[in-house]
A protein has these predicted regions:
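Forkhead-associated
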Residues: 4-88
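Short, compositionally biased
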Residues: 92-99
């Protein structure tokens, strides 16, 4: 099921008990209650930050297949074609698009 995230500096939270407007809770059993935060800066660059999840967050570069572990408190850029992996059970493909 595609999830559209409006470009904003507030962004959205992803997790089993994600809160806030647009929170994404359609995740696997190994995803933390508040797992990750995704947002867009004022230059339209997208980022993800791990929220001290139990099972980790990984960005897989769509062009190189290089995996980057997202450390809590550190933001990692997201690009179209990348995959965002939350734990072992949940993967999102990063696409650029409009409603």
């Amino acid at each position: 099921v595609p999830r559209w995230i409006q470009p904003s500096e507030e962004g959205v939270e992803i997790g089993a008990l994600a809160t806030g407007e647009g929170g994404i809770t359609d995740v696997g059993d190994d995803v933390s209650a508040r797992h990750a935060h995704v947002w867009c800066d004022d230059q339209n660059v997208w980022y993800v930050e791990d929220l001290s999840s139990t099972n980790g967050t990984v960005v897989v570069n769509g062009a190189t297949n290089v995996c980057t572990q997202v450390e809590p408190g550190r933001s990692v850029q997201l690009n179209p074609g990348d995959e965002l992996k939350l734990g072992e059970s949940t993967t999102y493909a990063i696409l650029l698009g409009a409603l």
